[in-house]
Amino acid sequence: MFDNIDNMARIEREIEKRMEAACEKSGWYVAVAMMTPESTTLHIEKFGEEPVAGEDAQAALDSAVAFAKAEFGTSVEVERFNEKIPNTRAPYHVTFLVKVDASKRVAELAA
């Protein structure tokens, strides 16, 4: 399915561009963390002075899940991590890893 690295990078950029539009209003950073022919993991992260929680975190997660379902139309697994980052101006961050069964959609993007 992936005949070369350039093609895979193009697909990753396209997914990131679409995902950023869903999250940019709340200041979240989005990247494709991992991509295989079977799945894509979206890494969604936000740094802040306090742990990210409540409505802001839920809104970003809802946007990510909605995007993944709309884009790929399949199941979504979500992991959430909160951890303190020492010696930084933004000592807390939250990361959502949204893994989607992307075989059909990735094949379309690769074509």
PLM regions: where:
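N-terminal leader/targeting segments
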Residues: M1-P37, Q58
